[in-house]
Amino acid sequence: MIEIIDLHKSFGNFEVLKGVNLKIEKGKITAIIGKSGEGKTVLVKHIVGLLKPDRGKVIIDGVDITKLSERGLDKIRRRFGMLFQESALFDSMTVGENVAFPLREHTNLKEAEIKALVKKKLEMVRLFGVEDKMPSELSGGMKKRVGLARAIALEPEIVIYDEPTIGLDPITGRAIYRLILDMQRHLNGTSIVITHDVPAIFDIVDRVGVLSGGRIIAYGTPEEIIHSEDKEIQEFLRQK
């Protein structure tokens, strides 16, 4: 369980998060949706301890991570996998080296074991025989898949997907969503998807939180959000 309590964050005079309250259920896929610039990525950075709030708590399995030292946060972060907006691949590394990076950093596996795991993770995201390619040789959708393979390399308990379909065409975007659902079933963990891509995301998630004006203004199942009578939510959904 991840619980966010009265989370506030400002940058200078600009207040981004104005008292976010949210419970992210274990073993579920939760989407956090909202317009661009609403602070979705800022919220994610608090969940993994990359930002400290001005006030409020982020509690993961009973531990308030806002009180942890950097060493304590490092242990927490090892429980996470992240797929970033732009895939965040290392341009100077091959695909195989990119996926192997967390395995080399955080395990004592032998090179043969790492290569076998890299092949397995790439096959899980429907990529075959691409280990020696460079990121520059890949399409946008393939880069996302490599990023996903790297995110799940250590079999994380929690995976965060930050705008996983941004820059992709609708067909490729739907394929990425199907992979997210497959990874959730494989890992049997907790998934958090940050997106403004609605209603497509509603097909795979269990819960939806709507971030607007620095707060979560609604939380429920996709059906509950779709049928909400809140004018702001309906306006957001109509724009999509």
Predicted regions and their residues:
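Conserved ABC ATPase "signature" region
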Residues: 63-64, 111-129, 181
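A short, proline-enriched helix->beta-strand linker immediately N-terminal to the Walker B motif
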Residues: 153-157
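Helix-to-loop junction immediately C-terminal to a conserved catalytic motif
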Residues: 48
